[in-house]
Amino acid sequence: MGAATSALNRRQLDEFEHIRLRPNGKKKYQIKHLIWAGKKMDRFGLHEKLLETEEGCKKIIEVLSPLEPTGSEGMKSLYNLVCVLLCVHQEKKVKDTEEALAIVRQCCHLVDKEKTAVTPPGGQQKNNTGGTATPGGSQNFPAQQQGNAWVHVPLSPRTLNAWVKAVEEKKFGAEIVPMFQALSEGCTPYDINQMLNVLGDHQGALQIVKEIINEEAAQWDVTHPPPAGPLPAGQLRDPGGSDIAGTTSTVQEQLEWIYTANPRVDVGAIYRRWIILGLQKCVKMYNPVSVLDIRQGPKEPFKDYVDRFYKAIRAEQASGEVKQWMTESLLIQNANPDCKVILKGLGMHPTLEEMLTACQGVGGPSYKAKVMAEMMQNLQSQNMVQQGGGRGRPRPPPKCYNCGKFGHMQRQCPEPRKIKCLKCGKPGHLAKDCRGQVNFFRVWPVDGDKTKKFSRSHSWGGTKCAPSTEQLYTLRPSKEAPAAVCRERETNEKSEQKPPSEQSRLERGIFFELPLWRRPIRTCIIGGTAVKALLDTGADDTIIKDTDLQLRGSWRPKIVGGIGGGLNVKEYDNVEVQLEDKILRGTVLIGATPINIIGRNFLAQAGAKLVMGQLSQTIPITPVRLKEGARGPRLKQWPLSKEKIIALQEICKTLEEEGKLSRVGGDNAYNTPVFCIRKKDKSQWRMLVDFRELNKATQDFFEVQLGIPHPAGLKKMKQITIIDVGDAYYSIPLDPEFRKYTAFTIPTVNNEGPGIRYQFNCLPQGWKGSPTIFQNTASKILEEIKKELKQLTIVQYMDDLWVGSQEEGPKHDQLVQTLRNRLQEWGLETPEKKVQREPPFEWMGYKLWPHKWKLQSIELEKKEQWTVNDLQKLVGKLNWAAQLYPGLRTKNICKLLRGKKNLLDVVEWTPEAEAEYEENKEILKTEQEGTYYAPEKPLRAAVQKLGDGQWSYQFKQEGKILKVGKFAKQKATHTNELRVLAGVVQKIGKEALVIWGQLPTFELPVERDTWEQWWADYWQVSWIPEWDFVSVPPLVTLWYTLTKEPIPGEDVYYVDGACNRQSKEGKAGYITQQGKQRVQQLENTTNQQAELTAIKMALEDSGPKVNIVTDSQYAMGILTAQPTQSDSPLVEQIIAQMVQKEAIYLQWVPAHKGIGGNEEIDKLVSKGVRRILFIGRIEEAQEEHDRYHSNWRNLADTFGLPQIVAKEIVAMCPKCQVKGEPIHGQVDASPGVWQMDCTHIEGKIVIVAVHVASGFIEAEVIPRETGKETAKFLLKIIGRWPITHLHTDNGPNFTSQEVAAMCWWGKVEHTTGVPYNPQSQGSIESMNKQLKEIIGKIRDDCQYTETAVLMACHIHNFKRKGGIGGLTAAERLINMITTQLEINTLQTKIQKILNFRVYYREGRDPVWKGPARLIWKGEGAVVLKEGEELKVVPRRKAKIIKDYEPRKTLGDETHLEGAGGSDHQMAGDS
C-alpha cells in the first residue's frame, strides 16, 4: 500500500472509500488521495506520518485552518481530506466531505482555541498577540458539549465592555460593522441581543436596527412557512423570524438549531447578518458623506486623503465588487493634480503601498522646495554654460534632499521618503499627529527665533480684547490693511518674564500691517535714495535694480540664484536702510533683478512677523433670504449734522479696518438710513442703522431661546464664573448673499462729493435676524465644547455665560480658562474685564453666590408727579421683584393706567394705590434670598390668597424658597375665587415645566369638599394637576349654594325683563305662583340689565329659600357660575342678596312658549315695550339633538330658533349637560396645516387628524401604533385634502422612516412638538377630547368601537356649527379651499389685466390719449386709470394693447431720488 496508505488500517480504509467527495455526488475517496496528501505535507513543513493518528490530523488542521479561507483550490482540497481522515480516526460516520467539515467545526471548534485554553497565563498573552480571542473568552464559545447535550457559555464582561467602548468612541462610524463582526463571531441570538441591550444611550440607532430586524423576520416567515399540522413528538420545530431574533425562542432551542437539528439552521449567523444590515444603515445615517464627495485638497497629504477615502468606503452600503471598482477608479480620479500625475505614472492598478510611497510629501513645503531647487539648478547650469561663468569651477556632486547623502538626487533615492511635521519640524510624523501645543494664532519671527504665542486682538470683525498682562506692544496699523495684527501676550506656560534690558529690539519694536490682496510694496530709503521695493519674507537677501540705485564704496561680485536663473550682482556691506521709521544696516545686492526686493536680512532687524490667525472662518454661515416677493430696502438717507457725519466716518473707518464693513459702489441698489447718538459718557458716538424696512422684508426667524434662564432652575455648584462674550454680533459672519441688503451711505457735508457706501460683513445691530443667528451659532459651538469639558455646566443666554462646576478653585479656574481658549479659537472673545470670578456675580439682573441668589437692589423712588411712563416702569420693577419678594401687589397701581394713552400724561394717585405702594415699599426693605434646585428633593408649590383678587405662590424644597410669584389675572367680568384658583394652578404648572421640567406638588388653600362641589359643574378648565388640600386661612369657599332640585313648599318667582332698543326704556318684574307680582320701570337700560334687575327684585322680596324661573340665558349663565366678585354693580348687588339666602333654585325655560307664569310675566313686562313672537319647531330640534347631539348653533340655523332656545335644548340634554361645550378660540393657521395624534378609546388605538384652520377631523381605529400604519393614514389624508404642513408630537411612530418618506413624497413639511407642553398640539388635543365626548354620547347606539369613531367624526364635521363663520367644520374646510382657488384665479386675472395699456379718446376730441392702465374690461366699456384718476370709457373709444416695454433689471436703476418714479407709482396703485 505504500507509506502514505499506512495512515489507515483496512477497516478504516473501507470506511474512507465509502465517503463521497461532494453531497449527492458519484465520486468517492480513493487511495490515490491519501498518496497525494502525503506528498503535499512537505509544502507546509509537516511530516506525512501525522496523517496516521487523530492528534496528527488535529495538528495539520491547526496549521491549515487560517489559510483555508484564502487558499488555493489544492490547499482547500488538502484541508477537506484531513478533516475526513480525522472523522475516520474518531470513528464518526460521515457520508460526504461537507458532513466531515461540519463535525470538525462543531466538535473541535478550531484546534488553536484548545491550545489557548491550556496555555499558561504567561504564554497566553504571548500567543494572543497574533490572534483574536473568542467573544466569550472560552475555547468552546458559544457552547460546550456535555454528553449529548449542549450547554450555553455566556459572553464575558470583557467582550461586552469592548463593544460598549467601541460604540461610544466611534459613534456608529464605519468601524462599528467589522468590530461587531469580530466580537459576535459564533454568537447565538441570545448573545447578540445582550450586546444590543447594553447600548442604552443610542435608542435612535437601535430603533433603526429593530426595524430592519422586523423586516427581515417578516421576509423569513414568508420564504419559510411553518409546516401544516402538528409536529411529531420529540421533533424540533423549524425556527421562525421571531425565533431567529431571540424573542420567542430559548437559548437551548437556539443551540439545538445550530448544532443538532436536521437540517441544521445557524440562527446565530442569520441574526448576525440582519444586525449587520441595520448597523450598515446606521453607519450611513451617521456618516452622510458619500465616497463620491471625497476629494483631495490642494495641499492635503495623500495619506490623509486615503484615510478619509477608505473611511467613506467602509460606510458605503455596496457589494465588494462595487467597492473594489470605487477604489480602483475614484481613488486616483479624485486626487489633486500633483498626486494624479504621479499616480498615473505608476501604470495600471498600482498597489496602495506603491501609491503611498510615490505621493509622500506631495504638496508640502519640502516637495515644492525640491522642485524649485531642481529647476533652478538646471537653469543655473545652462546660464553658466552660456555665460562662461562655470569655467574652472568643478561642479559639486548632487545631494539628495531625502537622505542628505551626495551622489544622487531625491527621485533616485532608494530609501523611503521621509516626512516632517509642519508644526514642530521633527521627522517621523505629520502635523495632524503632532502632540505638541496647537496654537491657533501664532506669530513667526522672520529671523527664525523661537515663536511666541499671541492672543487675538480682533475677533471675526476685528474687535479688540484686553491683553492678559500689562506689557503692551504698540501697533501702527496701515490704512489699507485689515485687522490682522495682534498685541503680544506673554504666556504663563513654558515662559519667564525678561527684564526690559534683556528684551530684544524685535520684542519691543513695532511692526506694521500689510494687505495681501496686492503686492506688499513699500518705499524705503537706501543709501539716501528712495526706492520702492517688495517686502519678501521668502527671500534671504535684499537685491535692488542697478537702474534704481547706485551705491559708492567697495563691492564684491556674486552670483545668486533666482526664479529666472543665476544673476551676477554686486554685494555692498553695511548699507543704511530706512524702513518705515527704523534705521537698519546690512548687506544690499545690486543687479539686474526684475523687481526690487527687501529680504529677511532687513525684515528680521525691523521686527517683522508673519501673523497667521485662525479667524472665524470656521464658524458656519447661516443662509438668510428675503420673504417671498419682497425686495430689499431702498430708502433715502436723511440729512445729518456735520459733527454726526464726521463721527460716522470715523466709526465706519475703524469698522472697515477691522473687517466688519466693506465698501460698495453704486451697483448696489439698496440703502438704509444711518444716524448716530452719543453714548452715556457723552464723549463717544454710537452708530445706529434704521433696519425697520429690512426687518419687514427679511424672512421670519424663530427665537431659539424662549426666555431667560432662572437661577432657581440651576443646580447648586461649588464654583461659579460668569463670562461675557465681547462684541457678540460682530463675531458671527453674515451670509455673503444677504450682505448687499445691509448697505448704507455716509453723506458728505453740503453734498461736496458722493457719499461713502458700506455693507455689513457680520451680524448688524438692530437687524431682526442677529439674535436668532447668534444664539443658534453660539449654541452649536458650545455643544462641541461641552463634549470636551464635561466637568463644567454651561448655561447660555445670548452672550452671557454662567459656568459652574463641582471642582476645587484652581481646577475650576483651569477649566474656565480652557473654555475661554476654545471660544477664542472660534472667534468669540471673552474680555478679561467682563469675567467675574468672585461672588457676588451679577448675571441677568440677579446676584449669585455658590449657595444662594438674590435680586439686584430695587429701590422705589418717590416723585411729586407721576406720568404714565413712570408708572409703567414702577409696575415693571414690582413684577420683577415679585419672583423673590412674596406679597407684592400691583392691582390698584395698574388701575391708574386705565384709559391713558400718552406716555407723558400725569396720573393722579388714588388712596388704594398709595396704600399698595407703601405696602410694597415696606416689603422690599426686607432682603430676600433664594436657593438652588436639587433634583433629588421633592418640589412643592404653596399658594396663598392675598385678597382683592390677588394671589401669591412659592416654589419650595424642604422649606427653602426657590422662587416666588404672584397672580392677579382676571379674564371675565364675573368670576369666583375657585375659577381664579384654577388659573393660578395652571400658571404655576406651566412655569414649573419651563424652569424645572416637572410639575410640583401643590398646596392650595381650599377644602376638598368645596373644590369637588364646584368642580363637578365647572368644565372650562382643560388641565388640572394633582394637588394637596391644605387648610391654611384664608380659605377659598363657596359663599352660596345653588340647589339642583326645586325647593318644595317655597313660592316660585317667574322673572323677566324687557327693553326697547330705540328708547332704551324698559321694565323688570316678577310674578309668583301665589299671585304676588311687582313691576318696575327702568330708564337707559338693556335687555340683559332688565333681566338681572328682575332677579334682584325677586331675591329682595323672597324669603330665605326661593325658587326662581327665568327665560334669560345670559342671566342664567352668570349666576350658575357662582361668581363671588364682579365689575358690574348690579351683579355685585345680586351676589350680596344670594349670600343671605339659605338655598336658591334657579331654572330656565324657553321664552314665548306659553309656559305658565313665564307667559304671564312676559306679557306683563312687555306691554308697551316690545313685540312678543312665539316660536315653533322646538320639538323637531329636540329630536335632532337627541339623535346627533348637535350643538346650539346648528340647531339655531337649521330650525330658525333663537340662540337662547337652542342653548337651552343643549343644556337640558343629560349627556350634554355634564360639561357643556368647549370655549372656542381663534387659531392662527394656514389652510394647509394639519395636526395628528394617537389616542386610546376602550383599549383600542385611534389615530386622529385635524385641519387646524377649520376644525375638520379624520379618525379611524388602527391595529398598531407603528410608523407603517401612521403612514397609511397620512396617505389617505394626502389623497383626500390639500395638506402642506403636518404637526405631531415626537412619538416613535410619527418620527419613523415611513412617515418621513410619505411626507417627502407628498411634499408635506413635518414638524414635531413636545408632549405635555402647553404650547404644542393644542388643536389635536382639544379634538381628541371632543371626539371622546361625542363617542360617549352615542356609544349606546352602535355595537363596535370602529363604528362609534366614524359616527362621531360625522357628527363633529357636519352636525355642529360654530367658530369662524358660524359654519360646520366640513363647510368651513370646503369654503377655505374654494376661497383659496378663487383668490389664486382672481390674482392671475388681475395680473394679466395689469399687463395691458389703453389708448382712448374723450368726447369729441379726436386726439388719442394714453397709455393708461387697464383696470377692468366689460362688454360695453372699460375702466382705466391715468395718474390718480379713474375713468370709464366706452369700448368703441378705447384701444387695448399689450405692454411690451422692456423690464428694468436691478442694475438698470439709477438709485437717485425720483428715478423710476412712475414705476413705483404704478406698483403702488396696483
Curated annotation (Swiss-Prot):
Record domain Integrase catalytic: where: 1227-1377
Source taxon at top rank: Viruses
Motif position, Tryptophan repeat motif: 1011-1027
Record text on cofactor binding: Binds 2 magnesium ions for reverse transcriptase polymerase activity.
Lipidation (N-myristoyl glycine): G2
Post-translational modification: Specific enzymatic cleavages by the viral protease yield mature proteins. The protease is released by autocatalytic cleavage. The polyprotein is cleaved during and after budding, this process is termed maturation. Proteolytic cleavage of p66 RT removes the RNase H domain to yield the p51 RT subunit.
Stretches assigned to the RNase H type-1 domain: 1047-1170
Alphabetized CDD domains for the sequence: HIV_retropepsin_like (cd05482)
Zinc finger (Integrase-type): 1176-1217
Disordered: annotated segments: 117-144, 479-504, 1451-1470
Residue intervals of the Reverse transcriptase domain: 658-848
Cofactor(s) for this UniProt protein: Mg(2+)
Domain notes for this protein: The p66 RT is structured in five subdomains: finger, palm, thumb, connection and RNase H. Within the palm subdomain, the 'primer grip' region is thought to be involved in the positioning of the primer terminus for accommodating the incoming nucleotide. The RNase H domain stabilizes the association of RT with primer-template. The tryptophan repeat motif is involved in RT p66/p51 dimerization.
Function: Gag-Pol polyprotein and Gag polyprotein may regulate their own translation, by the binding genomic RNA in the 5'-UTR. At low concentration, Gag-Pol and Gag would promote translation, whereas at high concentration, the polyproteins encapsidate genomic RNA and then shut off translation.
Note: The 155 isolate is from a monkey imported from Kenya. The reverse transcriptase is an error-prone enzyme that lacks a proof-reading function. High mutations rate is a direct consequence of this characteristic. RT also displays frequent template switching leading to high recombination rate. Recombination mostly occurs between homologous regions of the two copackaged RNA genomes. If these two RNA molecules derive from different viral strains, reverse transcription will give rise to highly recombinated proviral DNAs.
Name by which UniProt lists this protein: Gag-Pol polyprotein
